[in-house]
Amino acid sequence: MEKADGAAPGWYLTDLNARAATGADFLAILDERGTPVWYQRLDRALIDAKLLSTGNISAAENESRFSTKPEVGHRMIALDGTLVDEWLTDSNDHPPDKHDIAEIPELPDGRAIISYPLLDGVDLSSLAPDQSLPAPIRCDGSVAGVDKTIVDGSIREISGDGTLVWDWNMSDYFGMEEVRIPLCFKKYPAENSGAGEVDVFHINSLQRVVEDDCGTECDYVVSARHLDAVFRVDRPTDAVEWILSSSPESLENLSGAERLNIVGDPHFGPLRPHDAILKGDILTMHDNRSLTNPEEAARFVQYRIDTSSSDSADWTATMVRQIESPFGFSSGALGSARLADDGSVLVGWGSLQPVFVEYGSTGTELLRIAVPGVTPYRIVKYAPDDFDADELRATAGNTTQAPPPPP
């Protein structure tokens, strides 16, 4: 803890995954002074820790880049470390991805997952892979052609018994001309004649927007890193309602959705966004600005969305404020940003600078916690009543129960 000066009471839930192969991995809950009150040692690195309505904590195995194992789901962990359940996918062709999961309390054990299914026969002639990117993630120029293989982005609502309730796929609504930074992680190295699959969308955050008594059909706000875009999906119709993107407004969306007119943003929109959250008309995100040349500082950015005009061409996203990384670097990857009702903001500054900072409504630092040697994915602040301090202390210090090995 480097600074604690005025943060409102609350509980800070995060993962602390060791950079070194010999290090230990933990889930942890800190108080507003940055003091660890609860922790559980893990059998392996888990990310996307969040509190569910049941009082359990969900977290997912941190497979590199994106998840490819259909037999590995999101763990439901009690505070004492007991494995309560594991939420799996509905289909082996749709492995549950690690980046995010949205609870659907209206369905018993219901959830919306992200998946990166393989999709063959795609025309990638419009792609121009950036050959200046690092070799481990760079796409070979040969992937720019016809009949290629990508990983799609799928949102899948699944009931507690594993039944698919609803699904939605990126490739039905976004064209390859909209891809800004295709990467090839070679999770499937035999694809595309050895060049590996092309990750053209890369969904990395999923928020279920609970409003207007939406019941089981609530909209979703989605962040797609490789489109440099955040967008809203209308759940009842499947349509993309709007897109906030740094792409030119003249770039037509495959489904005809409007790109919001960005007002007052000196960067004209996000680059490699993450952790997009919509509350009312306020949209926030962690804008990684990664893989930029020259390097640009990561930032928290807040927009006000106005879709009141009868003409969707007049819809706007007006920047309310931004907070740039105190180090002046991009985030590389990871990163989170959460706006509280009192105007304070809690930011996890990503993989290149593992620091959590909470800012007051005027931008003053209230809390700074440095976590060297680990790569935390996200940090979320919960209200004082969401956890009991005595229970946290009483259940701390165990090793979480791991699921049995798959058959």
What is the predicted role of each segment?
Residues 1-407:
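Histidine-/acidic-rich catalytic cores in large beta-rich domains
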